[in-house]
């Protein structure tokens, strides 16, 4: 799953510091398997084995996040999320592996458990934005939650994160936004802003930051995160070469 991919990624980066390099290969057997959608890795086990055998590779960007329980930094490959999705991550971990159903149950629970998000300040590429927020995503990959198209135009090798800000809305409005996130059309909605950046920091102005990275909890009451992209840092074994 994505959490295991994250752990292996951090091991590969430690090996790089010691002068050793290896490619990242993935056989999908987790709850979400969202990273795999980016480089075209098959989400079934036989397909994943065939991809490893074919050994076609792609250089991809990764991210590094500093803060929370990782004051010295932690590498990630798919995303960092602040707010609603981090609470959802905690809730989905309590459930059996039921695929999309697990994530939908967790979302519904989170809508009622976690309603008022923090006010955050986002500093990115010499610009600053302060906003109330339901959820703020730093996406390297495209997908989260076993199929939600959070950043449908994201590329793993463009040297940029796709940023998604969902402002605070009513509970009823959250329900109506869910289909847009499933289809990747959330950018058409007035409460959603999307843009790109290579480096950013997130600071809690009011409230605290619950945050996750690749489905693993970074903090539940953090105050600041710093995030940067590392272009084309590792090789991934993928199903087919990407243009």
Residue ranges and their predicted role:
Residues 2:
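Polar, low-complexity loop segments and adjacent catalytic/binding residues used for recognizing
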Residues 5-6, 220:
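Short, well-ordered alpha-helical microsegments
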Residues 10-134, 138:
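Catalytic core of DAGKc-family lipid kinases
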Residues 81, 85, 137-151, 217:
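Glycine-rich phosphate/pyrophosphate-binding beta-alpha loops
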Residues 85-88, 130-132, 144-147, 171-174:
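Short acidic/glycine-rich loop or secondary-structure boundary segments that cap or lie
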Residues 96-105, 147, 152-173:
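Gly/Ser/Thr-rich active-site loops/lids in small-molecule metabolic enzymes
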Residues 116-118, 132-134, 157-162, 196-198:
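A generic structural signal for short beta-strands and their flanking turns/coil linkers
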Residues 124-125, 130, 155, 165-243:
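ATP/nucleoside-binding phosphotransfer catalytic cores, i.e., glycine-rich phosphate-binding loops
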């Amino acid at each position: 799953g994505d959490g295991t991919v994250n752990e292996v990624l951090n091991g590969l980066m430690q090996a790089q510091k010691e002068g050793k390099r290896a490619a990242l290969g993935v056989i999908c057997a987790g709850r979400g398997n969202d990273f795999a959608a980016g480089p075209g890795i098959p989400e079934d086990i036989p397909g994943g084995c065939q991809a490893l055998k074919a050994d076609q590779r792609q250089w991809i960007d990764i991210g590094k996040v500093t803060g929370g329980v990782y004051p010295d930094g932690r590498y990630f490959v798919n995303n960092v999320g602040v707010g609603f999705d981090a609470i959802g991550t905690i809730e989905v971990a309590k459930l059996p592996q039921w695929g999309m159903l697990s994530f939908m149950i967790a979302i519904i629970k989170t809508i009622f458990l976690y309603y008022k998000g923090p006010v955050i300040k986002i500093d990115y590429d010499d610009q600053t934005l302060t906003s109330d927020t339901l959820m703020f995503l730093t996406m390297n990959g495209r997908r989260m939650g076993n199929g939600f198209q959070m950043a449908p135009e994201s590329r793993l090798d463009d040297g940029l994160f796709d940023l998604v800000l969902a402002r605070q809305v009513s509970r009823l409005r959250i329900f109506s936004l869910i289909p847009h996130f499933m289809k990747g059309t959330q950018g058409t909605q007035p409460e959603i802003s999307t843009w790109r950046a290579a480096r950013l920091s997130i600071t809690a102005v009011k409230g605290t930051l619950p945050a996750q990275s690749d489905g693993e909890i970074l903090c539940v009451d953090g105050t600041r995160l710093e995030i940067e992209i590392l272009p084309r840092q590792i090789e991934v074994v993928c199903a087919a070469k990407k243009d």
